[in-house]
Amino acid sequence: MFFPTELMRMQSKQTIWLLSAYRSQSHAAWADWLTQTLTEINWCTLELPGRHFRWRIRGNPLSWLHKLPEETPDLILATSMVDLATLKGLHPRLANIPVIYYFHENQFAYPASKQQHDSVDPQMVQLYGAIAANRLVFNSNYNRQSFLSGIDKLLNMLPDEVPNNVTGDLKSKSQILPVAIKPMQNKQNKISNLILWNHRWEYDKAPEVFVDALIKLNNKGIDFKLALLGERAKKTPPALLKIENNLHDKIIINEKVNSEKYQHYLSQSSIVVSTAIHEFQGLAILEAVSASATPLVPDDLCYPEQYADIYRYRPNDRDALTEKLQLFLSSTPAAPDVSHWYSDKLKNKWNTLLNFTAPLT
């Protein structure tokens, strides 16, 4: 039983459905942070496991067909993995509910692996979802620009009956608001030559570029140590196997670790490297930099809007990465300030977005 004051407080709370159709690591951290931080909101969270990507992005309205709450929300916050247009079509009661469509990524700038077949379907899901939403929110400017450019390219390929100013209309209702990070503990006694890899060992992170640069560095006689973290398949990925075979004496840790150990190794690392060919916000690098690791990232994707020239190298260039690593190992620049991505700096911005007082456009 609720006391009258408690019941009034619950009734005064805004009810938001948080729909996340692909609970991967970064999507999960975002959803958990929102629901645990913005407690003045009455959250109703629906999520689907982060696997079977093609099925998830097209099948989520079917998976949720009989699972939506009976109470209609004040607002829907949906990730761009949600097939929003179909969801609204299947549930007419949601027709006039305002929706914020949040882009952790976009399918127009996502590199296909050799195991995937090309399909325009995921792009169309996000295009229709963006049109159906009241507001679009991106975690970086790169994410927004690549999405809008991708739509222009797609629409120019269509034979006829294409409406005018689609990208202009979408841009006018868009904004940038990053995923917040929790700063990691910063240790003063860092290992001066410890290089960190804290990304997934998958094709879109291009780990083979990292490995080849390390081997070149080793052949030059440069001393370094390695902390190899991040998710990996049960079968050791080829790039990781190559490191184990050629640089086993350099490795101090080689596993996906729990949160406590993750923070420990981030705080000990001096340099954190990315070789990604796909990155929309780069949370792993931001976390490491918050622990005062110095970033070394491609001059591409979201990185130019985050890090100065000194921290960047020519994309996919093994020699450039090797040279910059050698330079950083001899004299490591101070890590840049990333505090404007911290939870305490972004909480009010998220609160303002979700507690709007005027109709969304």
What are these regions (language model features)?
Residues 54-59, 330-361:
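A charged, aromatic-enriched C-terminal amphipathic alpha-helix characteristic of glycosyltransferases
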Residues 132-186:
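Donor nucleotide-sugar binding/catalytic pocket of nucleotide-sugar-dependent glycosyltransferases
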Residues 178-216, 226-229:
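Conserved donor-binding/catalytic core segment of Leloir-type glycosyltransferases
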Residues 230, 238-257:
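Nucleotide-activated donor-binding/catalytic signature segment of Leloir-type glycosyltransferases, i.e.
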Residues 264-269:
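Short alpha-helical donor nucleotide-sugar binding micro-motif in glycosyltransferases
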Residues 277:
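Aromatic "clamp/platform" in nucleotide-sugar-dependent glycosyltransferases that forms part
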Residues 294-297:
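Short hydrophobic beta-strand element within catalytic cores of glycosyltransferases
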Residues 310-319, 326-330:
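Conserved acidic donor-binding segment of nucleotide-sugar-dependent glycosyltransferases
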